[in-house]
């Protein structure tokens, strides 16, 4: 038998049954699941210093275990000296086993290392069961060597679920162990 991440096994063995009984689904296929996790990092100073973008890509790749891609500006913004199509950030889309491994690492290892951590905001859902939050420093991940980073920067994490509303999405993430503050 091949390797199955701990959170994926937990989802199949426990979470589905709990969600079906809690929300009175007729089938286990109606139970919401995590579709993908998108981790992104905006590097506004990449306009002046291309090395910052390369370091952001390598840091995201180290954190997630998957190669990051550059993101481009959708439109020009004169105030920030950004032209359309210019590289201004990086992102990684995680699916499958890598997604479950990252979620486990985020919930159990990285978030507890945040200074004065009291949980993530429970109201940051988008109305469709998807959850987004920001992390102020990338150094909370153990893969990042503090001495080798060029600058401390934050990153955004979006967890896309198949939940129909925020209540189902919050219940799903709570059962995975997401530490909500409210």
UniProtKB/Swiss-Prot annotation:
* InterPro entries the UniProt entry points to: Ribosomal_uL5, Ribosomal_uL5_bac-type, Ribosomal_uL5_C, Ribosomal_uL5_CS, Ribosomal_uL5_dom_sf, Ribosomal_uL5_N
What are the BP-aspect GO terms? Answer: translation
- A GO term, aspect molecular function: rRNA binding
Q: Name one GO cellular component term.
A: ribonucleoprotein complex
Is the keyword Cell inner membrane assigned to this protein? Answer: no
SUPFAM superfamilies assigned to the protein according to its UniProt record, in alphabetical order: RL5-like (SSF55282)
Query: Which is a Pfam family this sequence falls into?
Result: Ribosomal_L5_C
The UniProt keyword set, sorted, is: Ribonucleoprotein, Ribosomal protein, RNA-binding, rRNA-binding, tRNA-binding
* Signal peptide boundaries: none
Q: Which HAMAP family match?
A: Ribosomal_uL5_B (MF_01333_B)
Role, per record: This is one of the proteins that bind and probably mediate the attachment of the 5S RNA into the large ribosomal subunit, where it forms part of the central protuberance. In the 70S ribosome it contacts protein S13 of the 30S subunit (bridge B1b), connecting the 2 subunits; this bridge is implicated in subunit movement. Contacts the P site tRNA; the 5S rRNA and some of its associated proteins might help stabilize positioning of ribosome-bound tRNAs.
Q: What is its quaternary makeup?
A: Part of the 50S ribosomal subunit; part of the 5S rRNA/L5/L18/L25 subcomplex. Contacts the 5S rRNA and the P site tRNA. Forms a bridge to the 30S subunit in the 70S ribosome.
Describe the family membership recorded for this protein in Swiss-Prot or TrEMBL.
Belongs to the universal ribosomal protein uL5 family.
Query: Under which name does UniProt file this protein?
Result: Large ribosomal subunit protein uL5
Q: Organism, per UniProt?
A: Borrelia hermsii (strain HS1 / DAH)
**What lineage is this protein's organism placed in?**
Bacteria, Pseudomonadati, Spirochaetota, Spirochaetia, Spirochaetales
